[in-house]
């Protein structure tokens, strides 16, 4: 599930151009069940040669929790593969995971909840002390409505709110935070043309149910993908967030979430299309709406290797991930960062979707694996 996105425009694009140009953003697939294998640990010290200077990292004023966002496929794995994935996350040093909790999967038949997949995964994360962010979304076919022209209509708010409340009550001791929908600013995930007003109405229906089921729940809104404003297809994070703040009272959420993909650029870059750079604009919108207290959670960040037109080199992937952690650490307004992803979704080097992992599909380590392990080891030593 869930969506990683690419650089929007060519280098040198102006702000005005960035807001007008069509987006070419498609989320990576998340339904592949990886095969088991044994990890290797090949890497070099050059893996992080292009990251932020070490002196900047040492001067950081706070520690940012790091997790993985592995997509829904982790729930479809064998128990052996699931355990190996979680053990490898802990070996790297991450303490958090973003898990998909799909309404369509849980309530595939109307009125009948099947929690077996999520029960199994959450039992394993709990045994390892991994803290869970659950992203809830994905409407079942039986709940999807269409207009007279056959166009999909917005999410069934009442049905989704019931599901969210049931999930929060069931997992109140196992899930620490709840993210409402995944990349609702893209038609690909919203299904109907994306619309901030419709999303805000969903948040206002769901948040009280989450808090009723789990009074200690932390609620995240946004989950925004890199995008530009393209009518009927995508809404830029800035436009989308303004629409959310105009309609959602602050009591209904605790943090904003975004997916600040920057590849092929570094997260420290100043390109106008760079979503890591655009977070500054999101922060300004939050402050303008009296919400300087809230953090921005980075619930997906990564870069694909392989041979596709959008791929980066394996050493560059390592540098981008480490630099992303350091840059998040340097800013005073970020919450946890979740890396997409632990393991490649497939084996086609030419398919961008298959190559976001720090491990290959058969569990051989890319340079990013050891680079992250070193970085997080230093982080623990500083704390």
Label every model-predicted segment:
Residues 1-3:
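N-terminal export and membrane-targeting signals
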Residues 8-38, 44-66, 166:
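C-terminal region of N-terminal signal peptides and the immediate post-cleavage residues
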Residues 52-95, 100:
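Boundary/entry segment of secreted carbohydrate-active catalytic domains
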Residues 61, 79, 161, 195-316, ...:
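Noncatalytic carbohydrate-binding groove/subsite architecture in carbohydrate-active enzymes
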Residues 64-70, 97-99, 132-136, 178-180, ...:
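Hydrophobic faces of well-ordered beta-strands that scaffold small-molecule active sites
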Residues 76-90, 159-167, 234-246, 318-325:
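Short, acidic/polar
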Residues 89-233, 263, 348:
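Substrate-binding cleft and catalytic face of glycoside hydrolase catalytic domains
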Residues 114, 133, 170, 179, ...:
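Aromatic-rich peripheral "rim/lid" segments of glycoside hydrolase catalytic domains that contact
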